[in-house]
A protein has these predicted regions:
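A short, basic N-terminal segment
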Residues: 1-58, 83
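Mid-core helix/loop region of P-loop NTP-binding domains shared across ATPases and GTPases
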Residues: 2-17, 57, 92, 102-112, ...
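Walker A/P-loop nucleotide-binding motif
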Residues: 55-80
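Conserved catalytic segments around the Walker B and adjacent sensor/switch elements
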Residues: 59-61, 84-102
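Short, hydrophobic-biased segments on the C-terminal half of alpha helices
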Residues: 78, 174, 359-363
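Post-Walker A helix-loop "phosphate-sensing" segment adjacent to the P-loop in P-loop NTPases
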Residues: 79-91, 119-122
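C-terminal helical "lid" subdomain and adjoining coupling/linker elements of P-loop NTPases
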Residues: 167, 239-244, 252-313, 327-333, ...
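Terminal-proximal interaction/regulatory segments of ATP-powered molecular machines
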Residues: 324-414
Length: 414
């Protein structure tokens, strides 16, 4: 007797598979060769090289827009460094990768570091996800690290999100990490901060900046030719040969990603989604039509993810723009946006931010592509921002409705 999904699953068993290794198109994949990033690799390698002699390297800040290769270069250089240490019979550095957008509190950062070096509680159990004083979990980590002459390199990916979420707490987390070396006896910690925001430094406490930003490495966006080269390299690894025989597919993906400030991550995501669309439909080849459709899917998913991961204060500001747009306002100005935001903040029992801080959050929402702003001069009355939603009201409304707290407020405001 045929079962409900037999025919669907049979499609995946028949014919030539589209993918050979789809993981080659994911952000965490580290290829054997990294094209177009020799300068940055050499720079980071030269800074980290002293670890092979048992000397702690300087802290590094890597800057560049999303998809410019910052994270993959850091992973690649550390991977080669560890391999070289093992080949040479010297102690390899310990490494940890912390995604600061996900691991956003001091406790969770320290807990992940404990996990990475297998630092445990006095009774041998794992450090719990919650419940310990931060000082205690810090002591557990430092005691384990200092049990030998260790050098640990901690990569803080999207480090700017720590400070954007909460300036004071973010600076405290970074300061706590940078001052560890003053308390350790046998070991040392070095940090690699990775930021998508070139203005990130302006938000740092001077005492953090002076220590964290000892060395800076800039990653410029990839151009169209470089994106095409990266795509071709990954196509050869990820797809079976007949799957992408139309060169126009790679050219189109590269051109679309070049419009997105040379975002290689976006290009690889677009290529993977195109392949998955072809696979689900039982098509043997990836076409430009698949690419166009994949682009629409990714844009929709990107907006959803961007809104869902916003801090609550930023959601409140976005909601105020949405509420005014929903009332039929085409051009929304900072002052009226602030008035509605104040109502929302009060209803959510949030601290009401100053108008200047709300203006900063409006700029951040503009940078994320959720709203469009234009600065307008009002003569002797100064300047203001004209604001419009950059995405459909319906889509924003559906996402905001999924937030339980905001959906309750919406009933009173809309």
């Amino acid at each position: 007797m045929e079962k409900p999904l037999d025919k669907l699953f049979d499609k995946f068993l028949q014919g030539q598979a589209i993918f050979r290794d789809r993981n080659a198109l994911r952000p965490t994949y580290v290829p054997d060769e990294l094209p177009y990033r020799d300068e940055q690799m050499n720079r980071i390698g030269a800074i980290l090289g002293p670890t092979l002699r048992g000397a702690p390297p300087s802290n590094i800040l890597c800057y560049g827009k999303t998809g410019t290769g910052k994270t993959v270069v850091a992973r690649y250089v550390l991977q080669l460094l560890i391999e070289k240490a093992k080949q040479s019979g010297v102690v390899a550095p310990l490494t940890a990768f912390v995604n600061c957008r996900i691991v956003g509190t001091n406790y969770r950062v320290l807990r992940q570091l404990c996990e990475d070096i297998d630092a445990r509680m006095p009774d041998g159990s794992e450090v719990p996800f919650t419940g310990l004083p931060t000082d205690e979990i810090r002591s557990i980590f430092m005691r384990k690290l200092d049990s030998g002459p260790n050098i640990m390199v901690v990569v803080l990916d999207e480090v700017d999100s720590l400070v954007k979420r909460d300036v004071s707490q973010g600076n405290d987390i970074l300061y706590g990490l940078t001052r560890m070396n003053g308390e350790l006896i046998n070991s040392r910690v070095s940090l690699i901060g990775i930021s998508n925001d070139l203005k990130f430094k302006e938000m740092l406490d001077p005492r953090v900046l002076s220590t964290l930003g000892e060395e800076e490495v800039i990653f410029a966006p990839y151009n169209a030719v470089e994106l095409k080269g990266i795509l071709q390299q990954r196509v050869d690894i990820a797809f079976n040969k007949p799957a992408i025989s139309d060169e126009g597919v790679i050219n189109l993906v590269g051109a679309l990603a070049a419009q997105e400030h040379g975002d290689a991550r976006r290009a690889l995501d677009l290529l993977r989604t195109s392949g998955e669309l072809a696979e689900r439909r039982g098509d043997e080849k990836v076409t430009q039509g698949h690419v166009r459709e994949a682009q629409k899917i990714i844009e929709r998913d990107t907006i959803t993810e961007a809104v869902k991961t916003l801090p609550l204060q930023s959601k409140a500001v976005l909601f105020s723009v949405y509420a005014l747009a929903n009332r039929g306002k085409k051009d929304i100005f900072t002052g009226e946006c602030y008035n509605v935001y104040s109502e929302i903040a009060k209803a959510l029992s949030l601290d009401t931010l100053t108008q200047r801080r709300v203006s900063d959050l409006i700029s951040e929402l503009d940078m994320l592509g959720l709203i469009n702003t234009t600065v307008i001069s009002k003569g002797r009355y100064g300047r203001t921002k004209k604001i419009r939603l950059a995405v459909g009201k319906k889509q924003i409304g559906i996402i905001l409705d999924e937030d339980v707290r905001l959906s309750k407020v919406a009933k009173d405001l809309l």
